Amino acid sequence: MSAASDASVPDGAPPPTAPTRRARLRFLRGGKTRTGLIILAFFVLLAVAGPWIAPYDPDAMSDQLLQPPSGDHWFGTTHTGQDVFSQILVGTRGVLVVGLLAAAIATALSVLIGVSAGFLGGAVDEILSALSNIFLVLPGLPLIIIVASFVPDTGDLVIAVAIALTSWAWGSRILRAQTLSLRRRDYVEAARATGESTPRIILFEILPNLTAVIASGFVGTVIFAVLTEITLAFIGVADISHWNWGTVLFWAQSNQALAQGAWWWFVPAGLCIALLGTALALINFGIDEFVNPRLRTATGSSRKVRMRVGFTPVARKAPGTGHPGQYSSKEPRT
């Protein structure tokens, strides 16, 4: 009996937690996820080190007006001789700070309101759902423009808070719907039966099952916040003395860079916006593939060998034998 049990569990077998660890690392194995994380890490590095590695002061003027890219000015210069490359480097920090801060505040609000409404139910659900519906129907960008116009200093913090307050409602509705489907699960009922408190049930039973939804909402909010901040800077609502990619585009458009043929003034900022948006979208796609098994199955099914149409395996006599012993797919069924 002991020999059989020893044989059933080999010495070199991995611990029971190995499949769980592999499942957790599956998210990082995807090509989309890795590509998105590499691009995002590059921009984070620029945001951290940009002001120190910038070759020039982004506000410093010179006599080299509207010069194309060269060894001295990699991205060319503006109409006042300012270095575009230095402006892009310094502006990267403002873009990521506003995007990440706004997404963090909006995600915290959506988790707090959505999960509380879905789990508690009753009057709490009705009040919080009504609050979410009010913010859903409010036009986000016009409201941000109005708020920014009444604030004397529209810095990164003000813009991030304004974006967060107008972008949490849709995530809250999604989390409420997911929580409604989770609160009657067997493990949640078992936690209630053992006397667990409501905050502990939410923290240890509900939120771990909403991690992927929360992460996807966070990435989506970062994309929305980045585009909103750049839009506000481009139309001149945000403080144009704070450098970001939208500020670069604002000055390029105000001084008719396109009409003057100064493509180097606006193309680098546009490419940075496209690359950052692509990176965040790839990360979001990776989260979807990690959460949705159907997407992983569809990706893997493309590698399967397809049967030849019109031919089916039939039995053939093996050489030297008098009975069918081999199969062939070269003969059509008669």
Model-derived regions, located:
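Short membrane-interfacial helix/loop motifs at transmembrane-helix boundaries
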Residues: 24, 48-86
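Transmembrane alpha-helix signature in integral membrane proteins
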Residues: 84-119, 275-276
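Generic hydrophobic transmembrane alpha-helix motif, especially the helices
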Residues: 74, 105-109, 118-185, 213-215
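C-terminal transmembrane helix and the adjacent membrane-cytosol boundary/short C-terminal tail
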Residues: 166, 212-215, 219-220, 262-329
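Glycine-rich helix-loop "coupling/hinge" segments at transmembrane-helix boundaries
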Residues: 136, 147-151, 179, 220-221, ...
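N-terminal signal-anchor/first transmembrane alpha helix
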Residues: 3, 11-59, 131, 200, ...
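Transmembrane alpha-helices
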Residues: 93-109, 199-231
